Amino acid sequence: TRTLANPQDSETFLLAAMYAAQGYAVVATDYLGFAKSTYGYHPYLHADSEATTVLDSVRAARAAASSVGANLSGKVMFTGYSQGGHASMAAQRAAERDYGTEFNVVAGAHLAGPYNLSGSLRVPDAIAGVQFFVPYLVTSWQKVYGTVYTDVKTAFKTPYSDYIESLLPNPTLNYTTLVTTGKLPGGPGVTPNQARDLVFQPEFLAAAQAGGSNPLFVAAQKNDLLGWNPKARVLLCGGAGDPTVPPAIHQRAMKADFDSRGLTNVASVDVDALVQATYGPGGKAPTDPASAAFATYYGNYHGTYEPPFCHAQARAVFDAVK
């Protein structure tokens, strides 16, 4: 299975170029259930286990530093992108709240993360990649809490209900190849809403959208990152055009939550203009949903175009406090 210990991994390479090559000691851990972890599954977007995994990796790096001749300053900075943005924020929250004397947290840069998971359940339109990310989240939380559904067939339509609980994460197939091999619906001409409706039972989604005491909604609330007060400097970064983790649902809600308590140590940056200028045809986002350019642009926005711009913003914050 995939490991961030592989220097050829594109995310590892980006971290090496953006941070390690600039003098930072980078700790990039594999999560529970990946690589050499013996955990029985991956608790996807489970804030508490993300936090303990990241903090344990910092402890391990500190223990190993002297053996490789590294002198660490003791300053800790957290960053992550997408799921990693959720994990880095969960880690900063836990470090400041529970281990303030152990970790000298000086900054957190949380990039394109899904911080408002319960809010995202109430949005009527599906995200890009819904047929991958949402079943991943639902089956993970079912394994964590055991309450999300009583029978997999009440949540998922056939044939997906037959194998979805053991499909994700997949040791050999990624989102694209899961779709092209027919394990998940999708492909040219299939909209996110159509893909969602092929996978999920409509009653299951409607109940979650209603909120209240619905078990999926309650699980999402447990893993929201709203409502905490960071002590160190925080950067939120994303691109307004992101179709997978829309900032309107997550980044703006997170910033508004911080603002509601008068916090002055949080900045929020939108890199959409940079993404458009660099990757949009003629420097603008394509507007025709039926065009190949539209599919290419939005298909690459979250995973390829946006990350380097947000990591550059993160490093600027870290450079100011290192």
Locate each region found by the language model:
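Loop/turn elements at helix/coil->beta-strand transitions in domains of secreted/extracellular proteins
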Residues: 21-27, 73-76, 102-107, 229-233, ...
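Short beta-strand/loop motif that positions the catalytic acidic residue
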Residues: 230, 235-242
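Short beta-to-alpha linker loops that shape the active-site pocket of alpha/beta-hydrolase fold enzymes
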Residues: 25, 30-34, 274
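Short, surface-exposed "cap/lid" segments of acyl-processing enzymes
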Residues: 1-23
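Primarily recognizes the serine-hydrolase "nucleophile elbow" in alpha/beta-hydrolase
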Residues: 60-133
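Accessory cap/linker subdomain of secreted extracellular hydrolases
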Residues: 113-229, 248
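Alpha/beta-hydrolase active-site loop
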Residues: 44-67
